[in-house]
Amino acid sequence: MEENNIVLSRTQRMKDFVKSWALPVICFVVFWLIFKFVLMTSIIPTQSMYPTLSAPCFTVGVRTDVLNKPYERGDIVLFQRDDGNERFYAKRIVGMPGDVLEIKHGQTYINGVEYEESYLNETPEDLDFGPFQVPEDHYFMMGDNRNNSYDSRYWDEHFVPANKVMSKVYLHFHLGLSDKD
């Protein structure tokens, strides 16, 4: 009888061990799969999207291949450029495929109509650009901090191919660090 108790005791200990590790391991695998295939995170180190995203800012986006709807003008997205650099950029989609885009004295016009941008906190510098037509399967990107954003206005290739847009940003958190930290 004592032998059976020892065997049961070992069996019970093994079950308890498996139970105690199963939930954490399953949770880890599920979270890893979600962040590998569904969500995309990034830290935005610059003020190019200020005041919407204040650097340093942690962003969470849904990956393009999971997102089952097209991007819209005004969406903040994470993308890569065809510049040989592996880093991700966070900008706002301003120009959609087929749009004729022009900037006159800092004001953006899309298809000849003044584009209202309530998220800007200051008047953009007196810049003239275009008119250009956004090619099919491409986007024109600009940062919300127009006077401090390296974006489509300044790149040699002004337009971002749709296949380089990796995710749409849904959540963002200011990390609370200053430049002096």
What residues fall within each predicted segment?
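Protein maturation boundaries and topogenic segments
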Residues: 1-88, 159-181
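Acidic loop->beta-strand submotif enriched in PP2C/PPM serine/threonine phosphatases
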Residues: 121-137
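Short beta-strand-centered aromatic/proline hotspots
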Residues: 89-94
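Phosphate/adenylate-binding glycine loop and adjacent helical scaffold
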Residues: 143
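Acidic, glycine-rich loop-and-strand cores that form catalytic or ligand-binding grooves
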Residues: 99, 104-108
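Short strand-turn-strand beta-turns centered on an Asx-Gly dipeptide
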Residues: 110-112
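Active-site loop architecture of trypsin-fold serine endopeptidases
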Residues: 147-157
